[in-house]
From Swiss-Prot:
Documented EC number(s): 2.7.7.4
A single GO molecular function term of this UniProt record: sulfate adenylyltransferase (ATP) activity
Enzymatic class: transferase
Matches recorded under InterPro entries: PAPS_reduct_dom, Rossmann-like_a/b/a_fold, SO4_adenylTrfase_ssu, Sulfate_adenylyltrnsfr_sub2
Record keywords, A-Z: ATP-binding, Nucleotide-binding, Nucleotidyltransferase, Transferase
Role noted for this protein: With CysN forms the ATP sulfurylase (ATPS) that catalyzes the adenylation of sulfate producing adenosine 5'-phosphosulfate (APS) and diphosphate, the first enzymatic step in sulfur assimilation pathway. APS synthesis involves the formation of a high-energy phosphoric-sulfuric acid anhydride bond driven by GTP hydrolysis by CysN coupled to ATP hydrolysis by CysD.
Gene source species: Bradyrhizobium sp. (strain BTAi1 / ATCC BAA-1182)
Subunit structure: Heterodimer composed of CysD, the smaller subunit, and CysN.
Catalytic activity line of the entry: sulfate + ATP + H(+) = adenosine 5'-phosphosulfate + diphosphate
Protein name, entry field: Sulfate adenylyltransferase subunit 2
BP-aspect Gene Ontology terms: hydrogen sulfide biosynthetic process; sulfate assimilation
Length: 322
């Protein structure tokens, strides 16, 4: 495994010559942008100590760009928080550090110390336990340790059915639990931000965006993203119906497995052992957008953690997962 070289390097986003966005599409994106910026400003005005969760993916990149716009020329009045499972793609970590440094933002990184001490990994403990310990419990630890009362994230309603029924301002109990049967109405863009002692709020400014909206906005605003979203030849193994990229020497190969170099890209990014790639030749933004316009599958089809059970995402969210 040590002979497998690092397949990709941090690079600037590829900007091919592209047609100007249609006026209707441009107006739609501007409306989404205005709504998201208003939500970010509402969070800054209403909460004592907010934080923005930065998962390094395309949605987080758009959210970070919106936050920079919302408070320009000042910096966003909240830090970034990354929950590091220690199993993210190497390109993601390099990109995370690069963006925080370029923008001069405060970046908080938290790893669950108990999970680290127990050497919890997706290979030895399974995806369900690993996700609970290294993501859900780690997030709760970080929010409690810093006393954050609002956590902003880039989840969208079109991603997954449990997220589709969640409010933009999503109330959490003092133990960070979500009750899908007890949600607050959000009529006419009016949000109830009241919290009892110990409670908190999760806020989703991109709730009404679609995957295609995100890509159109990335192209329009020239937002830097992780190179893994672009197709390139990378080492993968086919495992349990998913193309898993061999990102470092820690990944144990099963009997008969040999990494093959294939042209792939990722529609969604997470921990590399639990994130399936998509065969693709879309190596620039225009090609990705063309691909998205004809896609009939969910971007989360490659997420192994979503296969735990039919209601796994909702259960995770009830327990405190973002």
């Amino acid at each position: 495994m040590s002979s497998l070289r690092h397949a990709t390097e941090i690079a600037t986003t590829r900007w091919p010559a592209a047609a100007e966005p249609r006026p209707a599409a441009l107006n739609h994106l501007h409306q989404l942008e205005a709504e998201s910026i208003a939500i970010l400003r509402e969070v800054a005005a209403e909460f004592r100590k907010p934080v923005m969760l930065y998962s390094i993916g395309k949605d987080s990149s758009v959210l970070l760009h919106l936050a920079m716009k919302a408070f320009h020329p000042a910096k966003p009045p909240f830090p970034l928080l990354h929950i590091d499972t220690t199993w993210k793609f190497r390109d993601m970590i390099a990109f995370r550090d690069q963006r925080a440094r370029e923008l001069g933002l405060e970046l908080l990184v938290h790893v669950n110390p108990e999970g680290l001490a127990q050497k919890i990994s997706p290979f030895t403990h399974g995806s369900a336990l690993y996700t609970d310990v290294m993501k859900t419990q780690a997030l709760r630890q970080a929010l409690d340790a810093h006393g954050f009362d609002a956590a902003i994230g880039g989840a969208r309603r079109d991603e997954e059915k449990s997220r589709a029924k969640e409010r933009i301002f999503s109330h959490r109990s003092a133990t960070h639990r979500w009750d899908p049967k007890n949600q607050r109405p959000e009529l006419w863009h009016l949000y109830n931000t009241m919290l009892a002692p110990g409670e908190s709020m999760r806020v989703f400014p991109l709730s009404n965006w679609t995957e295609l909206d995100v890509w159109d906005y990335i192209q329009l605003e020239r937002i830097p993203i992780v190179p893994l979203y672009f197709a390139a030849r990378r080492p993968v193994v086919e495992r349990d119906g998913a193309l898993i990229m061999v990102d470092d020497e820690r990944m144990p190969l099963r009997p008969g497995e040999t990494p093959q170099w294939r042209s792939i890209r990722f529609r969604t990014l997470g921990c590399y052992p639990l994130t399936g790639a998509t065969p693709s030749t879309a190596s620039d933004l225009a090609a990705i957008i063309r691909e998205m316009r004809t896609s009939r599958t969910s971007e989360r089809q490659g997420r192994v953690i979503d296969r735990d059970s039919a209601a796994s995402m909702e259960r995770k969210k009830v327990e405190g997962y973002f």
